[in-house]
């Protein structure tokens, strides 16, 4: 028997599986209070997915509101800047980059589905973020993929990593979108909890911006794209709202299945619809599917919405109404269209062989009403589903073990003394999973499709040309060191921000805005919530000091197996603009005879470093000290040095040694340097705010003058050339030996 609104009113005591759907007793009681009756099974399905952790941000939104406040403060401080065209609350942030162009970008997570089904979980993660960008009115132009895995030698890493990489590459390659950057980091805490964060960037003209709202009584609601099936019912909303025990997830809904060729048609179809001016409002169908799209569109509009659910095209005719509402089948969009434009809209869809059906209309009732074969199965206030879910002020407290962790500094660990020991240490580090060559991964991605990629892996940032006539472009970088964030989550978030900011600046771009993906353990653990709260506070304070807004992002909680949470991993993506991509600064030198300099100050900062991790298996102490004002000054210097320096490469994981290795191996041109003072500290410290640059021999004096003018410390290191990495007075490593150590780790482990 169909559970209609009338039946629900007549049978108030009907037993309902609210707990199995992830709702708590007080949440279920609140739903009954809102409706004045028990919910129908369809309404219960909608509330359960929309009030899930993944969709409602119920544990995190009390901390996230400071990012909205940050945008207001920056707007008051810089009233003429006007860079942010759309921010938090939309599908993705939109930033003005000049010349009438805007860029929209966002990073999201698809962590839990990628553990259950690595290929499809990762592939649909890419597909979902691409549709978010498309829904803003933009053409997607590139993707990136910050990834985290368990130990490289673990069986489960061998299960998930190849599938995740193939999923990211397969979907992006089929869409014709270049993958221009990302990360692949290995740590024991990610075993059983891999992180698949996906970023997409899109380009639009200012006048093409579209928002998710259902306005205009009588306007038609059109569902178009792929048919709705049983895949992904409760997918991310269920999976991302629980921890995994040793046996895997207790609730195991099917992971969404992606079809990139359908998505490619959907992109081109949607862009033509935008160009024809046929859309009053639009929303992609991602997490929570139709439940999300209908409730968010209706609550963001000025009235209500009526939907005839039996009109939805199905792949599986046996699906019940609640299953249709919960399905997370991919490659679907929902548009609000004026009645006179419906025929033209449907004609464009037919041209692209995209199925489209009018499923409802905008009303003035203030209610979201959904019928199934003429019987009402949903009648709710849309805001109560989409926006007025529970808000938890979860307890948080600095863990008792934090003091002991910070007291256990790596600076006291045994360190190499002789040149031979330094040589051996360097070779060990460059062959370690986090520092080794990642070509095994990145070679599965097309980095240059579309022909506008300017920089891609292994450069510090990805860069794409936006306008082929003016050469206007944008740069993007994603970063996070989870070990630093464990030692001090406030500082760790700021260090992630600073590194991504610096990586954008090394290419010659000016940082403008950020998106974030905050990956943490269970919010029910006060220690994890303290990490989360501190990371949010650090990110807000850092952005305030750098003068750049948070445009939006994503929170992924419950990344934890039993009592073991992942390292706190606040991934930060920074977007920058460059006026002329032909003048970008590459990350590595390509000729001999160039002078090598270090910008920034090196301090003895080894806690949380790759050296401590790889050589000693140690994690403790305080992370490196950060000076955000110095980071901003360094970025300004790098901008002024465009055309003067021939390469610029930031120092981060692995310190100066790693930067020299990557610079020398990129084009097979060696380097000879003299490291002042303590060679070990000079090579392996991970002090932030540093960049290695090269300049033609005759330009060194100009660089010295520029550094003095900006007040940035400058150290002469040596000269490029030869076929070895030479540290004067310490050791020499032929490039062939260095390359063997750097490039063989992943192929040997993964085949």
Curated annotation (Swiss-Prot):
Disulfide bonds: none annotated. GO terms for biological process: 'de novo' IMP biosynthetic process. Pathway: Purine metabolism; IMP biosynthesis via de novo pathway; 5-amino-1-(5-phospho-D-ribosyl)imidazole from N(2)-formyl-N(1)-(5-phospho-D-ribosyl)glycinamide: step 1/2. Its EC number is 6.3.5.3. It holds the Pfam family AIRS. It catalyses: N(2)-formyl-N(1)-(5-phospho-beta-D-ribosyl)glycinamide + L-glutamine + ATP + H2O = 2-formamido-N(1)-(5-O-phospho-beta-D-ribosyl)acetamidine + L-glutamate + ADP + phosphate + H(+). Mg(2+) 1 binds at residues 108, 554. InterPro entries: PRibForGlyAmidine_synth_PurL, PurL_linker, PurM-like_C_dom, PurM-like_C_sf, PurM-like_N, PurM-like_N_sf. It comes from Nocardioides sp. (strain ATCC BAA-499 / JS614). Belongs to the FGAMS family. ATP binds at residues 57, 106, 516, 553. This is Phosphoribosylformylglycinamidine synthase subunit PurL. Its main location: cytoplasm. Keywords: ATP-binding, Cytoplasm, Ligase, Magnesium, Metal-binding, Nucleotide-binding, Purine biosynthesis. Substrate binds at residues 109-112, 131, 256, 328-330, 556. It is found in: Cytoplasm. Part of the phosphoribosylformylglycinamidine synthase complex involved in the purines biosynthetic pathway. Catalyzes the ATP-dependent conversion of formylglycinamide ribonucleotide (FGAR) and glutamine to yield formylglycinamidine ribonucleotide (FGAM) and glutamate. The FGAM synthase complex is composed of three subunits. PurQ produces an ammonia molecule by converting glutamine to glutamate. PurL transfers the ammonia molecule to FGAR to form FGAM in an ATP-dependent manner. It is an enzyme of class 6 (ligase). The keyword Flavoprotein does not apply. The active site is at 54, 110 (proton acceptor). Monomer. Part of the FGAM synthase complex composed of 1 PurL, 1 PurQ and 2 PurS subunits. One of its GO terms (molecular function) is magnesium ion binding. GO terms for cellular component: cytoplasm.
